[in-house]
């Protein structure tokens, strides 16, 4: 069977690429360095495939189709919203595992939307290029990736409970896969940030540290207990992406965790948190 061996919770902040020199150099260096640390740790894990759980930003899915959750099972490229330092490119997909996750889910009460050809946005491509692709370079082998997109940025939002259940379904499907792949899962999202509102540029460090404390104690329940009203008020509309974190945490079933970095960066409009979700090797 395939095995999920680790996971990461990371941001996908496009302003880092558009305005890389906006914050003080030491702050910027810590944020970019956190991606490199994640890449080094991922390379050390010797994984074959990474499942990246992100969300659309009204770029890939429009008013005609807003899936609650979608998995890409075929040809991949991206990001659609390419920017300096994040160029559009072909992406190696683990088509067999992605198809299995969708098929297994359909038989188990999870009605996946399936994309047999897919172009990603920055929520996938930032962690892919900065962590997965970089780990491939360090390791000297190709690491494949599977995009999973949740409705966590555009309403109607996927519920927190269903986000957790979907992560559990991913874990169950991976365990049932007839292969010996080593898998990692990345939950891609910001903590506090306001997108397209007058509050844009505000970072609520207290809220961020509360969320990171829940992540570090592997406390999905406390994140799930946050009402959408509180998230929107204290974390902004961008913090609805916490659903991505919950889904990833449920999929990884970690034994411990480590804070790699946290920086509140108003110049990049968000709180940047990086957490590694670790599994006991004897259990993986």
Which functions belong to the PLM regions below?
Residues 48-54, 148, 181-189:
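Beta-strand elements within well-structured catalytic alpha/beta cores of enzymes
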Residues 12-13, 55-57:
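Glycine-rich His-Gly loop
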Residues 56-58, 191-192:
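Catalytic metal-binding/acid-base residues of hydrolase active sites
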Residues 155, 168-183:
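Non-transmembrane, aqueous-exposed alpha-helical and coiled segments at domain scale
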Residues 1-48, 63-165, 176, 198-284:
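Flexible, D/E/H-enriched segments
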Residues 189, 194-199:
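Divalent-metal (often Zn2+) His-rich catalytic cores of metallo-beta-lactamase-fold enzymes
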């Amino acid at each position: 069977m395939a095995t999920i061996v680790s996971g990461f919770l990371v941001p996908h902040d496009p302003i880092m690429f558009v305005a890389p020199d906006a914050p003080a150099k030491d702050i910027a260096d810590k944020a970019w360095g956190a991606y490199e640390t994640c890449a080094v740790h991922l390379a050390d894990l010797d994984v074959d495939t990474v499942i990246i759980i992100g969300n659309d930003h009204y770029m890939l899915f429009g008013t005609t189709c807003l899936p609650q959750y979608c998995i890409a099972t075929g040809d991949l490229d991206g990001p659609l919203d390419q920017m300096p330092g994040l160029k559009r490119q072909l992406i190696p997909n683990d088509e067999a595992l992605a198809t299995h996750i969708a098929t297994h889910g359909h038989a188990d009460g999870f009605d996946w939307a399936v994309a047999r050809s897919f172009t990603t946005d920055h929520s996938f491509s930032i962690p892919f290029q900065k962590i997965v692709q970089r780990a491939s370079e360090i390791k000297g082998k190709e690491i494949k990736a599977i995009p999973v997109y949740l409705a966590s940025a555009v309403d109607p939002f996927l519920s927190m409970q269903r986000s957790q259940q979907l992560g559990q379904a991913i874990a169950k499907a991976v365990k049932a896969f007839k292969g010996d792949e080593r898998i990692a899962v990345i939950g891609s999202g910001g903590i506090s940030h306001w997108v397209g509102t007058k509050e844009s540029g505000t970072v609520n460090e207290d809220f961020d540290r509360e969320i990171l404390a829940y992540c570090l104690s592997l406390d999905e329940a406390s994140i799930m207990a946050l009402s959408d009203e509180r998230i929107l008020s204290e974390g902004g509309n961008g913090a609805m992406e916490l659903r991505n974190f919950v889904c990833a945490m449920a999929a990884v079933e970690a034994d411990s965790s480590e804070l790699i970095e946290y920086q509140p960066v108003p110049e990049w409009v968000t709180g940047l948190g990086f957490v590694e979700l670790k599994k006991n090797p004897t259990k993986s």
